[in-house]
Amino acid sequence: MKAIKILCAAALMAATAAVSGAQNMYDAINISRNEYYGTARTMALGNAVTAIGGDVGSFGINPAGSAVANYNQLVITPGISVSVVGASYSPSGESGFGPEYGYDRTRMTLPNFGATAVLYTGRSRGLKSFTFGLISNQTAQYNYYADAYGQTSLSSKAAEFAAAAAGLDESMLVGNSAYDNGISWDIISAYQSGMFGSYGKGSNYVGVTETIDESGAWHYVPGPLAQHSAVQKWGSKNDVIVNFGMNFSDKVFFGINVGFPYATYGYSESFYESSVNPEQFPIIYNLDDGSQVETYFLSSSFSNRYIADMSGIYAKIGVIVTPFEGLRLGAAIQTPAMYTITEHWQYSATTSFADDYFSGYANSPEGEYSYNLMTPYSANFGVAWTFGDRAFVSVDYELTDYSVMRYHELHPGGAPMNDIFFDVNETNRHFAGVAHNLRIGAELRLTPGFSLRAGYGVATSPVRHWTNNMGDDVTADDFLAEYEDYYLSGLKYLVDSRYYGDRTRSLSFGVGFSSRGSFFADLGAVLTSYPDSVFMPYYDYDNFDAEGNPVNAASPRILNRSKLWNVALTIGWRF
């Protein structure tokens, strides 16, 4: 029972986090991360434009880029985003994955639009011109769909819910009392749909995917279950930028942005399981009149849907210097952004039996929660070499310090130790570190009106793990789960950290056309390859096998391999 109680506490802790939305380190990184899109030209150059400037898509990377162009601009960039994900299923552990199922999903996008105006001072030296701009650049696309299938007789999601509910009084899971008892709505929705129920005396629960031993001493999964896990994401993040630039003698260019990022991020997760042989999953219901009815478990499903709407503000300053012909140097620094985020979420569950009279479904109320998030600061540096007006090569380096991410209540009060985000922010401080991003781009002008472009980028993960004083390897989830009981009291402390070796890589290419008049058009494509990820659709839990031996009922693992294609067409006018 001790092990079950520990599991129950962990499950309830994780569920409580879900009840108040999704405020953990990984969510903060997801919101904070910028993957610049912009115009088709900057995308084709791998966004290695810190020292180049001129293009409207570069202003979000280096505000000084607006001062480089000595003409007004009006541009719009429609595009398409194609998510390609391969998913495979393993019934236990991170080995033995089955066949990979591939899925792609296409969405229309608008990576960029905007306009700039140049005002000349009439001077030939010193401050020659001012530039004002209003631009929208896309900085993230949440386009993702993954689906995996497999069979297992080792565990089930319905049984995991039953294990998580162990020790809870059944009256707390029914009716309107669920509003006030502090139990997570995922457990309540699963119970009210019939995914698990009580048996024997006391607060003992069993999943409808399990069989109870004749002695009533233990329960287990009696046969194979066909399982199906689906995850999808949608939405985008965009920065509306108010830009101001200054040109000093065509040698030094300075710019400042006030950015207003806004985003919608949607996440949906669905899990289905069904009996391969229903006769192996008998269910006996005790009716109020004392009689019994036997039926068979057919299938169950559980899903949660989460949507976050965000808006924020930040500032960014930048400079580009041309010390002598051919060489260009650029640098920019962005302040942390302060976001206000409002989340909505809901759980749904269904259960189906051979006798449809006992089938059920349940939906939780829709939850809502608002809070603030401070994102990291970032700094980028660039160097470029131009070969007259025929070609250039550019290299960028960007640094982002995720350890400064902090969640805040909208209306905080009390001592810092009473901050509901104190443990999460400590996790951010220790387990989110510095991410590095290297970008390379080149352009070759074949004729006065036609150019070829290519780029490459590689970015490191900011996530790290530690060794503690006990010699254990500690992840962010481990630290958060044990923070109050061990790390806050000093019984355990972190000793040495290491970064994971994950890399996100991108390859880009494109072409450009410039007419003799004001019209121009660019076409660009980017292929981004993300690190492989392993996903658990439910928690591991303690259970028994058919002989009554204690076992660790492990959740299946889902391996996802993800790539994202983005193709954009910029049309614009210079005047």
For the regions a language model picked out, list residue spans one by one.
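Hydrophobic alpha-helical membrane-insertion segments
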Residues: 11-14, 71, 398, 405
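Bacterial Sec-dependent N-terminal signal peptides
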Residues: 1-26, 575
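Outer-membrane beta-barrel translocator/receptor signature
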Residues: 40, 52-61, 67-153, 238
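Outer-membrane beta-barrel porins/channels
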Residues: 23-37, 42, 118-575
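Short charge-dense sequence patches
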Residues: 12, 57-58, 62, 255
